[in-house]
């Protein structure tokens, strides 16, 4: 399975440097000088190899210089390029509570009483933390976002293909927070 570890956001300067959005927990390894990256444009399948010539942090962003990319025009041509690895290249985690995103995608999500909620379609990474995007099953279809925290996600079994959750009251309610369904008996009508 192909996993994205970075995306070229834009060029930087006139000497061919690239601003890369990092999508890996190990950027110092993936983008080390001398590393060979495989990249492709979105919606294309042909991979091209790029060798990292230089890598540096600049204001919290990763800047890369690749062999053969020597000016702004070359760098602009790579805008949107996705750097990918094959999931078989990943080392297994030593931590039983640590998972790669692709390991969680597709797992069945159930409540602690066994009631099926849906399946994980994506792991979203935000400043506030990770969220599991769940495609609901049953009468209440649609997408559900569940914070990927121990207080809610009680267990994950890759072997069994199950994520068990114990959500707080209202989290699974599709009308939670919808003021149009609230009781209007306290209005100021005289």
Curated annotation (Swiss-Prot):
<dbReference type="Pfam" id="PF01782">
    <property type="entry name" value="RimM"/>
</dbReference>
<keyword id="KW-0690">Ribosome biogenesis</keyword>
<dbReference type="GO" id="GO:0006364">
    <property type="term" value="P:rRNA processing"/>
</dbReference>
<dbReference type="GO" id="GO:0005737">
    <property type="term" value="C:cytoplasm"/>
</dbReference>
<comment type="function">
    <text>An accessory protein needed during the final step in the assembly of 30S ribosomal subunit, possibly for assembly of the head region. Essential for efficient processing of 16S rRNA. May be needed both before and after RbfA during the maturation of 16S rRNA. It has affinity for free ribosomal 30S subunits but not for 70S ribosomes.</text>
</comment>
<comment type="similarity">
    <text>Belongs to the RimM family.</text>
</comment>
<dbReference type="GO" id="GO:0042274">
    <property type="term" value="P:ribosomal small subunit biogenesis"/>
</dbReference>
<keyword id="KW-0143">Chaperone</keyword>
<feature type="region of interest" description="Disordered">
    <location>
        <begin position="169"/>
        <end position="190"/>
    </location>
</feature>
<keyword id="KW-0698">rRNA processing</keyword>
<keyword id="KW-0963">Cytoplasm</keyword>
<dbReference type="InterPro" id="IPR011961">
    <property type="entry name" value="RimM"/>
</dbReference>
<dbReference type="InterPro" id="IPR002676">
    <property type="entry name" value="RimM_N"/>
</dbReference>
<protein>
    <recommendedName>
        <fullName>Ribosome maturation factor RimM</fullName>
    </recommendedName>
</protein>
<dbReference type="GO" id="GO:0043022">
    <property type="term" value="F:ribosome binding"/>
</dbReference>
<dbReference type="InterPro" id="IPR027275">
    <property type="entry name" value="PRC-brl_dom"/>
</dbReference>
<comment type="subunit">
    <text>Binds ribosomal protein uS19.</text>
</comment>
<dbReference type="InterPro" id="IPR036976">
    <property type="entry name" value="RimM_N_sf"/>
</dbReference>
<dbReference type="GO" id="GO:0005840">
    <property type="term" value="C:ribosome"/>
</dbReference>
<dbReference type="InterPro" id="IPR011033">
    <property type="entry name" value="PRC_barrel-like_sf"/>
</dbReference>
<dbReference type="InterPro" id="IPR009000">
    <property type="entry name" value="Transl_B-barrel_sf"/>
</dbReference>
<feature type="domain" description="PRC barrel">
    <location>
        <begin position="95"/>
        <end position="171"/>
    </location>
</feature>
<dbReference type="Pfam" id="PF05239">
    <property type="entry name" value="PRC"/>
</dbReference>
């Amino acid at each position: 399975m192909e996993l994205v570890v970075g995306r070229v956001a834009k060029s930087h300067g006139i000497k061919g440097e690239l601003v890369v959005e990092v999508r890996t927990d190990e950027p110092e390894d993936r983008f080390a000088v001398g590393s060979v990256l495989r990249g492709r444009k979105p919606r294309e399948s042909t991979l091209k190899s790029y060798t990292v010539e230089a890598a540096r942090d600049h204001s919290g962003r990763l800047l890369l210089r690749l062999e053969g990319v020597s000016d702004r025009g070359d760098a602009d041509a790579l805008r949107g390029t996705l750097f990918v690895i094959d999931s078989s290249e990943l080392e297994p985690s030593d931590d039983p509570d640590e998972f790669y995103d692709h390991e969680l995608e597709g797992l069945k999500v159930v409540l602690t009483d066994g009631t099926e909620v849906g399946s994980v379609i994506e792991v979203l990474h935000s400043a506030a933390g990770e969220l599991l995007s769940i495609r609901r099953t049953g009468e209440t279809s649609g997408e559900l976002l569940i914070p990927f925290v121990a207080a809610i996600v009680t267990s994950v079994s890759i072997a069994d293909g199950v994520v068990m959750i114990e959500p707080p009251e209202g989290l699974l309610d599709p009308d939670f927070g919808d003021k149009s369904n609230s009781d209007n008996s306290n209005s100021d009508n005289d």
